[in-house]
Regions:
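Catalytic core of pol beta-like nucleotidyltransferases
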Residues: 1-24, 33-34, 48-106
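Short edge beta-strands and adjacent turn/loop segments
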Residues: 28-40
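Short beta-strand->loop micro-motif that forms the acidic, two-metal-ion catalytic signature
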Residues: 40-47
Length: 106
């Protein structure tokens, strides 16, 4: 990842953790694999201690927008509770496989 992408991720993480200090964030997808093109988005798994609701999703989406706006990077947060991620059907999904194989914790 580029220095700009790394700084965007740091800014995003700091913003999310202001409200959700226990949040775990993992980059996955083409930018994590290193095969992104300039138009690729930045996929980020966000795992929270609590069940996300509409306000949670709106807040995290706003954090993503704010972090990526100036440098022109589109962040795409995918949000789950820790319980959903570790024990729900997503545990065996293609998304979970991709995160396990290529994910970069931030």
């Amino acid at each position: 990842m580029t220095k700009t992408e790394q700084q965007v991720l740091i800014n995003f993480k700091q913003s999310v953790r202001k409200r959700y200090p226990g949040a775990n964030l993992t980059v996955f997808g083409s930018r994590a694999r290193g095969d992104a093109d300039p138009e690729s988005d930045l996929d980020i798994l966000v795992v929270l201690d609590t069940q996300p609701n509409k306000q949670t999703e709106e807040y995290i989406s706003q954090c993503a927008w704010d972090a990526g706006f100036e440098p022109g990077i589109v962040l795409v947060p995918v949000i789950y509770s820790k319980t959903e991620w570790e024990n729900g059907p997503e545990k065996h999904s293609l998304l979970a496989t991709a995160v396990r194989e290529e994910g970069i914790p931030i």
